[in-house]
Structure formats: structure tokens, C-alpha cells
Regions:
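Interhelical loop and adjacent transmembrane-helix boundary motif
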Residues: 22-27, 73-75, 244, 251-293, ...
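C-terminal transmembrane helix and the adjacent membrane-cytosol boundary/short C-terminal tail
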Residues: 56, 195-205, 278-308
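Transmembrane alpha-helical segments of polytopic membrane transport and secretion proteins
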Residues: 1-33, 116-118, 297-308
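Transmembrane alpha-helix signature in integral membrane proteins
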Residues: 80-113, 123
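Short membrane-interfacial helix/loop motifs at transmembrane-helix boundaries
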Residues: 43-80, 148, 157, 254-256, ...
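Transmembrane alpha-helices
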Residues: 34-44, 127, 131, 180, ...
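Membrane-cytosol interface at the C-terminal ends of specific transmembrane alpha-helices
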Residues: 164-210
Length: 308
């Protein structure tokens, strides 16, 4: 068979493969479409219902004088409990993000410079990643509360005089217990991101700079940190977004007052006074918008890094 006579056969084979791939892709789309539709309907429907209820639609109170507007949003920021919750939420989210990033960076740099037992150290830092946050929060509560394990040990050895003498770490107004729970979970997560970045092309750049006589501190400032900074920034956005919007950890380890915004929204929603429902929905909407903006920033950042 000559080359010219084989060209139609090659074109037919190529077209057949393309069409087969299209059919396979369509089949995959149709297979996952029911699940996607259910998830999108539940999420988008609930989100839209929350927005509508926050501006006065679908009110549970029959009030002919009730107007459609943003009164619930203004009422939320005028509420002292909400203002205290906003301060606590930002404090917990910022401290958790900064501390987890700094500690994870130090651990990752130490592991990357360790030649022996590196895989063992990585496994140790990542063993608690599959553990749910609610389990971690429960463990912190059972360990560091005034009637917890550490308090009983210190009382047994005479370090503290009874459970009331043990410092308040959980269910405190500052949020120490919440921050501890986030650190225990987010440090390994940040280590995964940073270690992955440290295993990339930055290794060759670091070796080249080392060969040219650059000190480790200089390489760290001029080579390593600038290269892994996008990975660190992406991780901090994720950690901050989760810490900002999480509910179960502040509910278990926080106080009734002040509480984080997510807990305050739940308290208002379940309050016997049904007039607080729009305010609760307004808080939930604001929290969702903030988290959505953070997710959008994360996606844009990853897209820019992908182009590079």
C-alpha cells in the first residue's frame, strides 16, 4: 500500500478515534449529571433561599407591615453579640492561619534538609490529616479542659490544686482551644503543600546557588521562599477560609458569648424569637460571600501559577 493510498485510511482512523472519545465524554457527563444536579440544586437553592429570607421574603412571621430590604443586615452589625463574634472570628482565623503557616514552614524546611528518616518524619507530620475536625475538637476538649486529661495529671502530681486551678484553655473567651484545634489539623495540611513545592524545580535552583557559594540564609531568602510563596499563599487562603466559616469546632470549644459568626448565626436561627431568622440568614449570606471571594482568589492564583 502506497503512502498516498493510506492517507484516507489514516484520516478515517483519526476521525473514528475523535468521535469515540466524544461519545465517551458525553457518556461520562450523562452518568454524573444526576448527582451534580442534586448537589447544585440543594446548594444553590438553599443559598438563594437564605438570601431571599435575609431581605424579607418567605418570612415566618405574618406581618403586613414588613418591608423588603436590607434591614436584617443593618440589624446584624448593630447587634453587640454579632460584633463580638466578628472580632473573635477574625482573631481566630488570622492567628490560626499565621501560626499554622509559620510552624508548617519551619517543619517543612527542617524535613527537606534531613536526609535520614525523611519519609518517617513526613508520615508523622501527616498522620492526622484523615481525622475529621470534629474528632480533633473533641480530643482537644477531653485533653485540655479543666476536667480533662492534662488537668487530672497535673492535679495528681500536685502541680495544680484541683480542676478549678487549671488554666482555662477550652471554652474560653479568647479562643485558645479553637486555635489549638485548627493548628493540630492545619499544620499537617500546610506541610503537604510546602513539601510538595520544595520537591519541585526549586531543588535544582537551590543546589546551583549552593554550588556558587551562597549561604543557606541567602538561598532561603532569595531562592526558596520566593519560589514556594505561591504554594504558601494558596494554603493560607484555604486555611483562613475554613477557619472563618467553620461551625463545629467553635461550637464545641468556644463559649456561648462571644461566639464566632457561624455559631451566632445558628443561635439566632434557632432562637425562639422568630424575628431573628432574617438576621441569621444575613450572617450566613455574608459568611458565604466572604468564603466565596476567598475561593475565587485561590482559583485565580492557581490559574496564574498554572500559566507560569
Amino acid at each position: 500500500m502506497t503512502e498516498k493510498s493510506s492517507q484516507p485510511l489514516l484520516r478515517f482512523t483519526h476521525r473514528f478515534r475523535v468521535e469515540r472519545n466524544k461519545v465517551r465524554d458525553r457518556k461520562v457527563v450523562w452518568l454524573i449529571l444526576p448527582t451534580v444536579l442534586v448537589l447544585v440544586t440543594l446548594f444553590v437553592g438553599g443559598f438563594l433561599f437564605g438570601i431571599l429570607q435575609s431581605v424579607g421574603y418567605f418570612s415566618v412571621i405574618a406581618d403586613e407591615e414588613q418591608k423588603i430590604g436590607f434591614d436584617a443586615y443593618f440589624a446584624a452589625f448593630q447587634n453587640e453579640t454579632v460584633r463580638a463574634g466578628i472580632i473573635l472570628t477574625f482573631r481566630v482565623a488570622i492567628l490560626s492561619t499565621v501560626l499554622s503557616t509559620v510552624i508548617a514552614l519551619a517543619i517543612s524546611l527542617m524535613i527537606s534538609r534531613t536526609k535520614r528518616f525523611q519519609s518517617t518524619l513526613i508520615a508523622i507530620t501527616q498522620f492526622n490529616i484523615p481525622i475529621p475536625h470534629v474528632v480533633a475538637a473533641t480530643g482537644i476538649l477531653l485533653t485540655f479542659s479543666q476536667s480533662g486529661l492534662v488537668s487530672r495529671v497535673t492535679n495528681h502530681f500536685g502541680i495544680t490544686d484541683g480542676t478549678s486551678d487549671f488554666p482555662i484553655i477550652t471554652n474560653d473567651p479568647f479562643g485558645y482551644g479553637i486555635i489549638m484545634s485548627y493548628l493540630w489539623k492545619e499544620i499537617p495540611f500546610m506541610c503537604v503543600l510546602i513539601l510538595s513545592a520544595l520537591r519541585g524545580p526549586v531543588t535544582n535552583l537551590d543546589e546551583t546557588a549552593k554550588t556558587l557559594g551562597a549561604s543557606y540564609s541567602y538561598r532561603l531568602r532569595k531562592v526558596i521562599l520566593p519560589y514556594i510563596f505561591p504554594a504558601i499563599l494558596s494554603g493560607t487562603i484555604i486555611v483562613f477560609a475554613f477557619s472563618f466559616g467553620s461551625y463545629e469546632v467553635p461550637y464545641l470549644l468556644g463559649e456561648p458569648y462571644p461566639s464566632t459568626v457561624s455559631v451566632v448565626a445558628y443561635q439566632l436561627y434557632t432562637d425562639r424569637d422568630l424575628a431573628n431568622r432574617p438576621t441569621a440568614m444575613a450572617l450566613a449570606t455574608i459568611t458565604s460571600v466572604v468564603i466565596g471571594l476567598l475561593v475565587y482568589a485561590y482559583m485565580k492564583l492557581t490559574q496564574q501559577e498554572g500559566r507560569k
